[in-house]
């Protein structure tokens, strides 16, 4: 469990980025954001390009955010290479990809970050990745399994899902830190969306998808129940993943749940709320 203590005057959360790094820099400038923390709730877009691409992006954020005293915190989604979220690979003063179960302490709040999720389009992405590996193997005259390890630009990672981590939850309990807010990529089973109407085509292609999605939401239920049983007094839970905004303004068990939309390029807009 990593704890990030950051001095700031405000803390915000935004939904899925899907590689919209430059638009986020412009958003920060356009809204004149200063002395703040911005938590990005997964699907950042790490891993689809070569490592050097993200190093360049990080330097751009450092230049802009250091002048404004803004810190961008990113947690992993299902459109991310999990290796970027080890706490070391992307750990700049103002631009950080944090591990699951990290705690952000800022503005008098303790915010627990829980990444991971299942890709509804994983069947298609796996096929595309296998096709890329075949091409690489043929071009470099090597076995397919070796090519799959070496291709730089991947589009799917098998270890994308949410992880229930007893050890990390034990650490949180022993630390005595009260969690005020949870920021995650996906959410518990009783939160929106409550149906799978929008993903029927993916369910037809991927016979194990529905059970895996149900298990994902059940895992979030288990995490919540464990935190509650440990005496945590959580007030707000913010998540992304589902690509629309929802807030029913009625708390569930004393917790206010907010789902954030993804970055909309045609609107040039992030779905951002203050925590």
Model regions and ranges:
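Core catalytic region of metal-dependent phosphoesterases/phosphodiesterases
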Residues: 3, 14, 19-107, 201-203, ...
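Structural motif
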Residues: 30-31, 172-174, 227-229
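Active-site-proximal loop/helix segment associated with metal-binding centers of metalloenzymes
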Residues: 109-218
């Amino acid at each position: 469990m990593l704890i990030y203590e950051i001095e700031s005057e405000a803390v915000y959360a935004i939904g899925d980025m899907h590689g919209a790094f430059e638009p986020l820099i412009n958003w920060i400038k356009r809204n004149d954001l200063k002395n703040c923390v911005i938590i990005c709730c997964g699907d950042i877009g790490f891993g689809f390009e070569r490592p050097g691409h993200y190093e360049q992006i990080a330097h751009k954020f450092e230049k802009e955010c250091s002048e404004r005293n803004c810190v961008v915190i990113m947690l992993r989604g299902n459109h991310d290479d999990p290796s970027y979220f080890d706490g070391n690979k992307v750990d700049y003063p103002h631009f950080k990809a944090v591990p699951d179960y990290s705690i952000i302490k800022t503005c008098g709040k303790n915010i627990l970050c829980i990444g991971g999720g299942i890709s509804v389009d994983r069947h298609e992405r796996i096929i595309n990745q296998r096709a890329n590996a075949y091409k690489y193997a043929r071009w470099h005259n090597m076995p397919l399994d070796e090519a799959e390890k070496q291709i730089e630009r991947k589009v799917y990672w098998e270890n994308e899902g949410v992880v229930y981590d007893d050890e990390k939850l034990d650490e949180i309990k022993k630390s005595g830190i009260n969690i005020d807010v949870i920021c995650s990529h996906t959410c518990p089973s009783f939160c929106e969306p409550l149906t799978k109407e929008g993903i029927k085509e993916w369910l037809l292609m991927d016979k194990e998808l529905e059970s895996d999605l149900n298990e994902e939401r059940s895992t979030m239920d288990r995490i919540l129940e464990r935190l509650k049983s440990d005496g945590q007094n959580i007030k707000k839970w913010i998540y992304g993943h589902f690509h629309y905004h929802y807030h029913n303004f009625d708390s569930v068990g004393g917790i206010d749940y907010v789902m954030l939309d993804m970055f909309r390029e045609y609107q040039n807009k992030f779905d951002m709320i203050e925590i």
